[in-house]
Amino acid sequence: MVEDSQETTHFGFQTVAKEQKADMVAHVFHSVASKYDVMNDLMSFGIHRLWKRFTIDCSGVRRGQTVLDLAGGTGDLTAKFSRMVGETGKVILADINDSMLKMGREKLRNIGVIGNVEYVQANAEALPFPDNTFDCITISFGLRNVTEKEKALRSMFRVLKPGGRLLVLEFSKPIIEPLSKAYDAYSFHILPRIGLMVANDADSYRYLAESIRMHPDQDTLKVMMQDAGFESVDYYNLTAGVVALHRGYKF
């Protein structure tokens, strides 16, 4: 129950007090962490790997640079960036959820990604890094879970170096109406059943579907990034807008 005096936000389709959302999202990801990679492959039929590959290709990351993989989870992007920046560069895998961070650290160490990767538990709304630290920041399927997205975007802008870029990979609004209806049917009816069968957790995947619906559409997120200070903001619709990659620069 939310008191009238409390500031509210959404948790999926629920209206909750702002201070409650972070804990509720944390519960979701504590629950799904061990099955996160398996569920990503099942939910997207493996296409998430292509979306992430495109993000890497658009990042412009070079040897010797410093990269922040925010809401980096199990480290798919970090693994690629680690090879790209080489021994003279650095990648920080940051996530607010310690269960996801532990899964990412274990996974990357098991495949030999060590030496130039650091792990930091961090809230996107108040990043614990100095101004002008990173050449590139990515946040992949994480922004929709943030309570105050505008505050998080301003925090990302602050820690980017001049000339740096932010890439936001996130579920978005399909641009083809028949696909939009089919996507809703899949998200709200099939996805929770897959979550129940594979992860024994239908509720977390019901939240996933609801959080996608509540996330700002392509043009709204573009304006939010511009309002946070980013310039030359553009976006790419992937899989007909099921996912969008937004990119903006700090000059």
Curated annotation (Swiss-Prot):
Named from the GO MF annotations, one term is:
2-methoxy-6-polyprenyl-1,4-benzoquinol methyltransferase activity
Pathway as given in its UniProt record? Quinol/quinone metabolism; menaquinone biosynthesis; menaquinol from 1,4-dihydroxy-2-naphthoate: step 2/2; Cofactor biosynthesis; ubiquinone biosynthesis
Binding-site positions, S-adenosyl-L-methionine: T74, D95, N123, A124, S140
The reaction(s) catalysed by this protein are: a 2-demethylmenaquinol + S-adenosyl-L-methionine = a menaquinol + S-adenosyl-L-homocysteine + H(+); a 2-methoxy-6-(all-trans-polyprenyl)benzene-1,4-diol + S-adenosyl-L-methionine = a 5-methoxy-2-methyl-3-(all-trans-polyprenyl)benzene-1,4-diol + S-adenosyl-L-homocysteine + H(+)
Show the InterPro entries listed in the entry: SAM-dependent_MTases_sf, UbiE/COQ5_MeTrFase, UbiE/COQ5_MeTrFase_CS
Keyword Membrane included in the entry's annotation: no
Keyword hit for Kinase: no
The alphabetized UniProt keywords are: Menaquinone biosynthesis, Methyltransferase, S-adenosyl-L-methionine, Transferase, Ubiquinone biosynthesis
**Any single biological process term in GO:** menaquinone biosynthetic process
Task: Name the Enzyme Commission number(s) assigned to this protein.
Answer: 2.1.1.163, 2.1.1.201
Q: Into which family does the record put it? A: Belongs to the class I-like SAM-binding methyltransferase superfamily. MenG/UbiE family.
The protein's role, per its UniProt record: Methyltransferase required for the conversion of demethylmenaquinol (DMKH2) to menaquinol (MKH2) and the conversion of 2-polyprenyl-6-methoxy-1,4-benzoquinol (DDMQH2) to 2-polyprenyl-3-methyl-6-methoxy-1,4-benzoquinol (DMQH2).
Name under which the protein is recorded: Ubiquinone/menaquinone biosynthesis C-methyltransferase UbiE
Query: Organism source for this protein?
Result: Salmonella arizonae (strain ATCC BAA-731 / CDC346-86 / RSK2980)
The organism's taxonomy opens as:
Bacteria, Pseudomonadati, Pseudomonadota, Gammaproteobacteria, Enterobacterales
